[in-house]
Amino acid sequence: MKKLFLVVTLVLLSVAFLSADVYIKQQTKTGAFMGQPAKDIVQEQWFGNNRIATVTQDNSIVINLAEKKFFMINHKTKTYVEASLPLDMTKLMPEQMAGMMKGMMEGMTVSVQPNGQTKKIMTWNTKGYDVKMNMMGMDMKMVFWATTDVPFDWKKLASLSGELYKAQLRVGEKFVEEFKKIEGYPVASDMEMMGIKITMATVEISEKTPPANLYAPPAGYTKKDKFAMEDMKQ
């Protein structure tokens, strides 16, 4: 399982109930490491009508709270996994990964604390939060910059985002509760892990009509009962 899958998706929080959905576009830059070139990933997030979707070029994760459904969609292989909420990711893992996943989740520690710093990022007034994580003996340090100056109910999003955290980061309730200490929506973050620097920046927050069938697997995609090892490498 790629540990950096953790990195790209550490910023989720709430949904507005509007005729148009909330659209958020973010850019994550990862420095070169272990012979791998630097990466620049664009991620789109959509929130609306009790539905949450996060989309990259290769994958989509959809949470439909009204129908209590979860979808993880692999656009490369044109396959998807469907599950009911509340989500237990270990039940969807390949057998050889389930035990390892459970051990990682149980052994993970996280601490979130306000650091007293403020910063103006684009049009947003933000406050800083220091986040420290340890997973399998690997320390990760992050700084999140969160703002309440957003055109949606960030408190509502924070209360709805737990299942999406679990799906993207493969974590449990303790992790979710700790991240609720962040007041506002994180519009930027800086992270360092094993000498690798990762930065995330929000470049757009707006209201848009979502694409057709955004919150469901595309027609013609094949349903799978569990993730394959290939999915864990995404």
Provide a role label for each language-model segment.
Residues 7-16:
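Bacterial N-terminal signal peptides
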Residues 20-234:
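Extended soluble regions of mature proteins
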